[in-house]
């Protein structure tokens, strides 16, 4: 008897769901027809990038081209791009939801585009491999389930040496990639020692600013620093401050050594730090920690 009652209840709920699919679904395209619109909350470049990407791939799947409009009141079945993100969304993070039958994708910085990519991957089953190389299953119907998703990147900066990012913007967006000039203040990205402490300015009069090994100091364009020298720290800190002030829209900079094996400073003070930390990276990490303490609202990368 109990089993019969439970079965009847389950069948009743299934009937409700089938009779009223809009209670659990957001219908974008049905049998090759659509009244859905892509609505931009803000008329800016990142919103247009997200909208164009979504429009392109929904059309590839369904042959339906959804119109893109700006600042209109959404109705059921519409897609809202942009707007306020939940508090837990961080830089380049995003939110996807299908509340009230409306698909909403918002994010911070590039996050709204990454939200579109995630929707296309996880809910429409699209894979993008490279320029004009993608896989998808054509369908005349696109119905989305209930979605309430927030995602933030595990890494603040994401880069690859694949040259496709220069010729294929979709590949770049799809793989959530960035380029140094987009993120790092004044393009200060890897091997920045001689930019921050130019040897042609300081090398001749202050060889003590540069690494000591094999019995002497080695100032030069490819030299490392004497990272325990307090004057070096102050000069670099002032230089970093001026760069950030000249680039107020950026908050990341690379303070990173030059290439070269066994060219690190082995003066008594630097060696003591490295010995204490148990690695040759000890002195550079100690230096960067001091720099991070001086600029608590900034971020630093190194090699």
Model-inferred region functions:
Residues 27-37:
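Immediate post-signal peptide segment of exported/extracytoplasmic ligand-binding proteins
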Residues 16-19:
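N-terminal signal peptide c-region/cleavage motif recognized by signal peptidases
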Residues 1-11:
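Bacterial N-terminal signal peptides that target proteins for export
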Residues 67-90:
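Short, well-ordered secondary-structure micro-motifs within conserved domains or adaptor modules
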């Amino acid at each position: 008897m109990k089993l019969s009652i439970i079965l009847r209840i389950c069948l009743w709920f299934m009937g409700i769901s089938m009779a009223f699919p809009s209670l659990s679904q957001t219908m974008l395209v049905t049998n090759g027809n659509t009244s859905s619109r892509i609505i931009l909350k803000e008329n800016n470049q990142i919103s247009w990038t997200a909208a164009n990407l979504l429009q392109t791939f929904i059309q590839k799947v369904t042959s339906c081209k959804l119109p893109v409009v700006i600042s209109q009141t959404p109705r059921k079945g519409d897609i809202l791009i942009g707007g306020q993100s939940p508090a837990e969304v961080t830089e380049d993070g995003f939110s996807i939801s299908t509340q009230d039958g409306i698909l909403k994708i918002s994010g911070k910085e590039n996050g709204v585009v990454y939200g579109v990519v995630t929707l296309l991957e996880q809910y429409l089953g699209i894979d993008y491999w490279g320029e004009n190389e993608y896989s998808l299953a054509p369908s005349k119907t696109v119905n989305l389930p209930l979605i309430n998703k927030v995602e933030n990147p595990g890494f603040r900066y994401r880069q690859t040496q694949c040259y496709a990012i220069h010729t294929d913007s979709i590949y770049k967006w799809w793989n959530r990639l960035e380029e140094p000039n987009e993120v790092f203040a004044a393009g200060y990205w890897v091997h920045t020692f001689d930019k921050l402490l130019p040897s042609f300015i300081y090398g001749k009069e202050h060889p003590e600013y540069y690494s000591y090994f094999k019995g002497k100091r080695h100032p030069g364009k490819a030299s490392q620093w004497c990272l325990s020298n307090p004057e070096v720290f102050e000069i670099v800190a002032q230089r970093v401050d001026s760069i950030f002030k000249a680039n107020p829209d950026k908050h990341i900079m690379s303070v990173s050594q030059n290439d070269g094996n066994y060219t690190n400073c082995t003066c008594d003070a630097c060696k003591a730090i490295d010995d204490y930390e148990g690695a040759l990276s000890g002195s550079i990490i100690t230096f960067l920690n001091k720099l991070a303490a001086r600029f608590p609202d900034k971020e630093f990368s190194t090699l």
